[in-house]
């Protein structure tokens, strides 16, 4: 391979690498803020002969750059996608699949082996 061919090839590879690096996904900030827990309602008890634990309003969530955290004892963590899809997990590994609507309300459901629980959080004004 001649020196000129190598130079052209190197320039082409370099030129192709620049747009790929420039297309890294931007952080999701449209949903940033604090969301206060509104309710947790047992939607269905699926366990045979087992009682679902009594529910209380979930602890507040803070969303920053697509990352969800809570500081209470339940320790919710998760992610928010660009369309408002939310996946949450707490310290007990409970998974809640949720969505943020245009009004800033997060609604989601936990589907466990014995219970289904519907959760609601509402965004607080800045």
Regions found by a protein language model. Name each.
Residues 1-9:
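Bacterial N-terminal signal peptides that target proteins for export
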Residues 8, 111, 124-125:
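Small/flexible residues
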Residues 9-11, 28:
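Intrinsically disordered, low-complexity segments enriched in polar/charged small residues
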Residues 23-25:
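Boundary of Sec targeting at the N-terminus
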Residues 27-101, 107-118:
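Central antiparallel beta-sheet cores of small beta-barrel/beta-sandwich binding domains
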Residues 117-126:
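Short, low-complexity, Pro/Ser/Thr/Gly-rich segments in the mature regions of secreted, periplasmic
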């Amino acid at each position: 391979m001649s020196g000129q061919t190598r130079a052209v090839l190197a320039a082409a590879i370099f030129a192709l690498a620049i747009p790929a690096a420039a297309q890294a996904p931007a952080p999701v900030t449209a949903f940033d803020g604090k969301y206060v827990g509104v309710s947790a309602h047992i939607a269905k008890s699926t366990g045979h002969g087992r009682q679902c634990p009594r529910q209380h309003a979930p602890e507040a969530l803070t969303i920053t750059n697509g990352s969800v955290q809570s500081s209470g004892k339940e320790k919710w963590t998760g992610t928010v996608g660009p369309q408002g899809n939310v996946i949450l997990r707490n310290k007990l590994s409970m998974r809640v699949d949720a969505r943020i609507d245009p009004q800033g309300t997060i609604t989601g459901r936990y589907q466990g082996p014995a219970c289904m629980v519907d959760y609601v959080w509402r965004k607080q004004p800045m």
